[in-house]
Amino acid sequence: MLKLRLKRCGRKQQAVYRIVAIDVRSRREGRDLRKVGFYDPIKNQTCLNVPAILYFLEKGAQPTRTVYDILRKAEFFKEKESTLS
């Protein structure tokens, strides 16, 4: 099963996260299938690869709670609903 989850990058005390598609059994820092976004909580920046995220969601990937909140805050699901209508 696939998950969309955060992978920690950056320096000490300056965490930056990549949003990645990864197998559930892998470690947090394990090898990811694909990088689908970027999140910087310090600068409050988010960058999303929408086609890649849609692809993995259609394949059955489940976002973690934090990734779901990031996607909702970026109004990702409003875009998805408008493309489905």
Curated annotation (Swiss-Prot):
Which Gene Ontology CC terms are recorded?
A: chloroplast; small ribosomal subunit
Q: Sorted alphabetically, which Pfam families does this protein's record hold? A: Ribosomal_S16 (PF00886)
Q: Where in the cell is it found?
A: Plastid, Chloroplast
Signal sequence extent: none
User: Which InterPro entries does the annotation name?
Assistant: Ribosomal_bS16, Ribosomal_bS16_CS, Ribosomal_bS16_dom_sf
**Top-rank taxon, per record:** Eukaryota
Sequence intervals crossing the membrane: none
Keywords (A to Z) from UniProt: Chloroplast, Plastid, Ribonucleoprotein, Ribosomal protein
**Statement: the UniProt record of this protein carries the keyword Transmembrane helix:** no
GO BP annotation list = translation
One MF term in the entry's GO annotations: structural constituent of ribosome
Please state the protein's primary subcellular location. plastid
Which family, according to UniProt?
Belongs to the bacterial ribosomal protein bS16 family.
The record, for NCBIfam families, names: S16
What PANTHER family does the record point to? 30S RIBOSOMAL PROTEIN S16, SMALL RIBOSOMAL SUBUNIT PROTEIN BS16M
**Name of the protein described by the UniProt record:** Small ribosomal subunit protein bS16c
Report the source organism. Triticum aestivum (Wheat)
Show the taxonomic lineage: Eukaryota, Viridiplantae, Streptophyta, Embryophyta, Tracheophyta
Gene that this polypeptide is encoded by: rps16
